[in-house]
């Protein structure tokens, strides 16, 4: 008997579940890289696209926004960036919860 894990069968079960989480995390990483999440500002005049890892992919500006002052354009860009980042981070958090939410690792006091 290994201290903290109980009988050998529980160790095998814990290792199997850990492998499932690892495999799921690898799939999730690929999904996050392929996602496109759009943050907007100014009723869609400014759009920033990031992937599920919060990496910037694209910025789109409606030509109408270029008639505004530099300060306004900067504020709109920042707002769209924060919006995209927030959505991406929340998506990542939810997906990680889905991945690990039902996993119980016996003997570790988790789940």
UniProtKB/Swiss-Prot annotation:
InterPro entries: YbaB-like_sf, YbaB/EbfC
UniProt subcellular location: Cytoplasm, Nucleoid
Disulphides: none
Keyword Cytoplasm: yes
Gene Ontology cellular-component annotations: bacterial nucleoid; cytosol
Keyword annotations from UniProtKB, A to Z: Cytoplasm, DNA-binding
A GO term for molecular function: DNA binding
Task of the protein: Binds to DNA and alters its conformation. May be involved in regulation of gene expression, nucleoid organization and DNA protection.
Protein family according to the UniProt entry: Belongs to the YbaB/EbfC family.
Name by which UniProt lists this protein: Nucleoid-associated protein CYB_2894
